[in-house]
Each structure stands twice: as structure tokens, then as C-alpha cells.
Amino acid sequence: MAFYDLSKQERAELVSEIGKRIFDDLQTSRFNALHSYFADDDTYIRKSAYLSVGRIYTTHSTLQIKIIETLKTLSAEDNFKIRQTVINAAGEIGKHEFENVQEFFDKGLFDIHHSPRNAVIGSIKKMGEVNPLPVLAWAKKYLHHPDKEIRREICHGIELRGRKHPADILPLLRELQFDKTRRVRSTLVHVIGQVAYKKGCIETVVSHLKDWENKELVTEALKEIIDVHRRYRDFAAMSQKQAEKYLLENIPEGL
């Protein structure tokens, strides 16, 4: 029976059982339950498992080295679901101690399967939101990587931090302004739009875009900002007309 076929109480009991069995595995170095949960076909079972690992790491300092060693072992498994769940578990740890799990993301970016790579992007988002300094410093190293997909994924990964704190990621986005790859460019424009519609954010974005050298890209970005205020009109701090008026008044050369 799938996770969400269970009742709310049954789900809570299952999550508790998963946590207990993983804790027992780590204490006894067996890893049977850990391996099974990390490989489970049910996304929510795997999620419960990696969240449990993150909680155990935080609450039981004596098991931290064991957890890192175990994740390293599991990261070499052939099953991509296990490798994906390892990265998600590392992402939970990286919310507080990124340096201890950085190697999992260095490796996961180049995984042969898209699922672990996507887990890296998801982890960058959740870690960057609460632990931005080391995560963004790490991301910056890959902004000019020769693989265009790596550049695109990093650009996408830092977006969530920028939703509330655009000033933190705009200097990194600026480094991509002359990227010649269409997919990277379109992702860059998309991210600029995504970090510009919440309260106080359009002002920060515009103040940065004024200094960008690639005026053609700036124009694309401004059009995206206007359109984002239409698409997200129920959530945006300004209406589409207000956003367009603000841009015309503050960066008219871009439109």
C-alpha cells in the first residue's frame, strides 16, 4: 500500500517506524532498513527516510561520522533511487553543516541519471534558503563550467534564495549574462523574473540590472518581470501595470 493510501495516523506511525529502524541500523552498522527505504519505489517512503537521517544527524552527534560514512557507501550503489536519496539526505544535513556534505553535491552534479542530478538542484534550493553563505560560494564555482547543463542547473538551484533575498544571488546571475547557450540564457531570464515579484524585490533587481553590460538580456529580463507580475498577479506585490510603470520610470533604457 502506497504512503498516501494510508490514514493520517497510519502515516505517522510508519514515519516513526522508519526513523526507529534507521536509528537502529546506524547504531548496529547493519543498514538493511536504510538500504531498503532509500531504494523504495514510493517517493514518500524515501522522503521519510532522508528526513529521518537529517533529524538523527542533528540530534545524535555521536552518529554523525557514521552517517556520513554510510551515505558515502550508499552513494556508490547502482540503484539511482538510492543515490538520489543519499543526496536528499545530504541536503538535510547541509542546511546546517554544508561543508560536511559538499562532496555529495560535487559528485551528484555529474551523476549519469537525471534523478540524482535533480536532487542536487532541489538540495541547493533548500540549503541555500537557510544556509546561504557556503552554498552560494560553492555554487559560484560552477557558473562557468564547460558543461552547459551544469551552468543551467546551478542557475536554477540558487533561485529559491533569491525569492526573498535577491541581492544574495544577483551577483552570481550577473556572471551568466553573456552565456551563449539558449537554455542557460532562458533559465537566467526566468530566474530574474522569479526573484522580482515579491515585496521590495523589484527595486533590488532593477538596481542591479542597471549595471549589467548585456543590455539585450536586460531587456528580455524586464519583459519577463512584467509578465511574471501578470502570471503571479495573486501573489505579486505590484500589479502588472504598476510593475511596468516602475520599470519605465527607473530603467527606461531597458524597455
What are these regions (language model features)?
Residues 2-25, 47-61, 83-96, 115-130, ...:
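Structural detector for internal amphipathic alpha-helices that build alpha-solenoid repeat scaffolds
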Residues 7, 41-43, 78-79, 112-113, ...:
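Short inter-helical turns and helix N-cap capping residues of alpha-solenoid HEAT/ARM repeat scaffolds
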Residues 25-37, 58-74, 95-108, 130-142, ...:
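Amphipathic alpha-helical scaffolding segments comprising HEAT/armadillo-like alpha-solenoid repeats
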Residues 33-53:
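Short, contiguous, helix-prone interaction/anchoring segments in small proteins
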Residues 40, 156, 165, 254-255:
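N-terminal secretory/membrane-targeting helices
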Residues 44, 81, 100, 115, ...:
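Structural detector for tandem alpha-solenoid helical repeats, activating at a conserved register
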Residues 141-143, 148-159, 170-175, 182-183:
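Extended, charged alpha-helical interaction scaffolds
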Residues 213-255:
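Eukaryotic acidic, Ser/Thr-rich intrinsically disordered low-complexity regions
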